[in-house]
Amino acid sequence: MGDIMIDWFFHTLKSYPEIAIFLSLALGYYFGSFTYKGLGLGAVTATLIAAVIIGQIGITITGPLKPFFFLMFLFAIGYGVGPQFVRGIAQDGVPQAIFAAVVCVFCLLAPYVAAKIAGYDVGSAAGLYAGSQTISASMGLATDAINRLGLSPEETKKILDGMPVAYAVTYIFGTVGSAIVLALLGPALLGIDLEAACKRYEEEYGGKKQLGGPGTAWHQFDVRAFRVRERGPAVGKTVQEAEALIPDQRVFILRLRQEGKIVDATSDAVIHAGDVVAVAGRRDVLVQLIGEQAEEVDDRELLAMPIEGVDVYVTSKDVDSKTLEQLAKAPAARGVFLRKITRGAIAVEIPILPNTKLNRGDIVTIVGRTPDVAAATKMLGRPDRATDMADVAFIGAAIAIGALVGAIVYKIGSVPLTLSTSGGALISGLFFGWLRSVRPTFGRIPSPTVWFMNSVGLNVFIAIVGISSGPGFVAGLKALGFGLFLWGVVATTAPLILAMYVGKYVFRFHDAIVLGCCSGARTTTASLGMVNDRAKSQIPGLGYTVTYAVGNTLLTIWGMVLVMLMT
């Protein structure tokens, strides 16, 4: 009975390969979710392993399913990093963008040299590159390039079957090793006390302007009611003059109770002894403003103000590249406090310091009275309202346009050159992602949808690759041997060590962000998390967003370039 059930199961998977794909995804996402100290296989590697095991029974998958999901994935990658990529190329992120490009060259050359020395074929070399640099997306472009080599179908399949083998063997150290090299070895090799460097960075960029810890006046606040005593420092002053008594702190007088009546605190309203004032700010600073002998009052009616928090998508060119300190002086910023700033495709949290610059495409969480929040939102951009509706017409048109452009073949002499449909979809994503950050009236793709296109798009592609190469996987692993793992260690480690020294001594990045720049250029999010943990700060993330955008793009394209170098 058991044999009959197994035979039926295998026969069903062969007859309906879509079931095998979903089964690979289920197993991959489940086992990929397990981590130890923040490190694990991840969904991509776990899906590949599950697909290879399932593929041992010999399942054939045909049709456009694989390129369909891969194009969707590449577009999502470009769409997510587009604003940071363009900023890095065109504006104030140029040093970090150039650094990322240099690191990407190291990341290409190390596995290329390793593959040449080891004598690997082009498929194994592409897998070695993808695994050691943890850039799964490159396998799609490498596959396109290999298919265009003009080899026989049998030889092409043999080469392509070697790619997932090399990827699976080298990916684990590519992930774990990168985190170890950057977070644990990096500070020692560079002679950096990471925690002290981050504190130094905060002081240099405005952190000491805040009492009670760097940045706290920007996002830690309370609203209290105080009675103004005789001869208090605010007596006889207008609201604007009273708020200016402590220039380095964000303190706002919101309402007044004068002669029993509640009035809004306009900038020219005069404060008198005996008034009850509703003030927003840190409590120790509030007492300093009103006077040491200030009497706190439980005036619930005065304090009953509508307070709201809003996520704002920054689109205004008037605030682009402005520091928080500059923006705080704008009338529209009065009465508003920052809770959080996130940036980039993976929503890296940016430290809140007076000299922190806002960029178009950032999402800032602001809190304050409803009218104050509305004014600040208008100054910054527009509310980033949650929605479950994606502009599918835009997605389809954008991917189609990119793929059409990529399909064009350019001839230089007798040499045909093409971006391929994959490269076209990636570039389309970059362009339209940037365009939406400056013209957010179209092309809405909610973050969960971008995640789905990114994650599921890649993993369906990986599942099909694994299932198709399953029968030849074991034979390929035996042929490549343990030496492949060691070459993967070399290909992972060498570029990172070079990157750290180049970042510190050639580009002269601040000690607090140099490892974040290296993490971004290698697109290794696990490393950034470990670096932040070592630093006990979010400061290293300031070096991550631009380098990640450039690195993610170039490392993906390198999959095609590596095939050209190997042939």
UniProtKB/Swiss-Prot annotation:
Domain of life: Bacteria
GO BP, one annotated term: potassium ion transport
InterPro entries from the UniProt entry: AAE_transporter, Asp_Ala_antiprt, RCK_C, RCK_C_sf, YidE_YbjL
Keywords associated with the record: Cell membrane, Membrane, Repeat, Transmembrane, Transmembrane helix, Transport
Chief site of localization: membrane
Pfam families (alphabetical): Asp-Al_Ex (PF06826), TrkA_C (PF02080)
Signal peptide: none
Cellular-component GO terms for this entry: plasma membrane
Transmembrane segments: 15-34, 41-63, 68-90, 97-119, 170-192, 392-409, 413-435, 455-477, 481-503, 540-562
GO molecular function terms listed in the Swiss-Prot or TrEMBL record: monoatomic cation transmembrane transporter activity
Bilayer disposition of the protein: Multi-pass membrane protein
Subcellular location: Cell membrane
Record-annotated RCK C-terminal domain positions: 211-295, 297-382
Gene3D superfamilies found in the cross-reference section: Regulator of K+ conductance, C-terminal domain
Family recorded in the similarity comment: Belongs to the AAE transporter (TC 2.A.81) family.
Name under which the protein is recorded: Uncharacterized transporter bll3476
Natural source organism: Bradyrhizobium diazoefficiens (strain JCM 10833 / BCRC 13528 / IAM 13628 / NBRC 14792 / USDA 110)
Lineage summary: Bacteria, Pseudomonadati, Pseudomonadota, Alphaproteobacteria, Hyphomicrobiales
